[in-house]
Amino acid sequence: MTDLYAEALATFAALYAEAQNSAEPEASAMTVATANVDGRPSARTVLLKAFDARGFVFYTHLDSAKGRDLQTHPQAALLFLWRSLREAGIQVRIEGGVQLVSADESDAYFASRPRMSQIGAWASRQSQTLGSREEFDAAIAKVEATFEGREVPRPDGWGGFRVVPQAFEFWYGAKFRLHERWRYEADAASHWSKRMLYP
């Protein structure tokens, strides 16, 4: 891990801790932007579940729209927006390649989830058409009956993605739009640079 990458990761960690201890209602919420095989972009909000020097992890159904995007076009952009921090909020952007986390990691995280969340992962066919809420409720009841009295295993089609950073951008909001921006970026040889940007 290069010094500048370590610096960017430490900066994120400090800001994330600050957001967790602030009035932010959901500090771990992040927008994940992907593109499908035709290059059509889409974005949605998910929760950050882990991060370290290897990257930033979230979990989902692998056959969901984002899951399919990331398996056919393994690049993503993340966006954290913490409006309550500092003078006028802080925004962090992270861009990078994407890889599946190991089955062991996915198993461990799935086992830590509330039981009803585990059941929901089995009952939901994420991103597919649903005829009615009653249909979903019936699917939930069926899964509950299937696993009654025993642990709920992780579905084969559910797992984690790790975004491996190739760029970080830190935006510190200020009055009169006189913001401060810093960008850390890796080149093709994985050499990191740091520069300040006009707001």
UniProtKB/Swiss-Prot annotation:
Substrate binds at residues 49, 109, 113, 117, 177-179. Pathway: Cofactor metabolism; pyridoxal 5'-phosphate salvage; pyridoxal 5'-phosphate from pyridoxamine 5'-phosphate: step 1/1; Cofactor metabolism; pyridoxal 5'-phosphate salvage; pyridoxal 5'-phosphate from pyridoxine 5'-phosphate: step 1/1. Its EC number is 1.4.3.5. GO terms for biological process: pyridoxine biosynthetic process. It catalyses: pyridoxamine 5'-phosphate + O2 + H2O = pyridoxal 5'-phosphate + H2O2 + NH4(+); pyridoxine 5'-phosphate + O2 = pyridoxal 5'-phosphate + H2O2. It comes from the Bacteria. Gene3D superfamilies: Electron Transport, Fmn-binding Protein, Chain A. FMN binds at residues 44-49, 59-60, 66, 91, 126-127, 171, 181. InterPro entries: Pyridox_Oxase, Pyridox_Oxase_CS, Pyridox_Oxase_N, Pyridoxamine_oxidase_dimer_C, Split_barrel_FMN-bd. It is an enzyme of class 1 (oxidoreductase). NCBIfam families: pdxH, PRK05679.1. Homodimer. Belongs to the pyridoxamine 5'-phosphate oxidase family. This is Pyridoxine/pyridoxamine 5'-phosphate oxidase. The lineage of its organism: Bacteria, Pseudomonadati, Pseudomonadota, Gammaproteobacteria, Lysobacterales. The gene is pdxH.
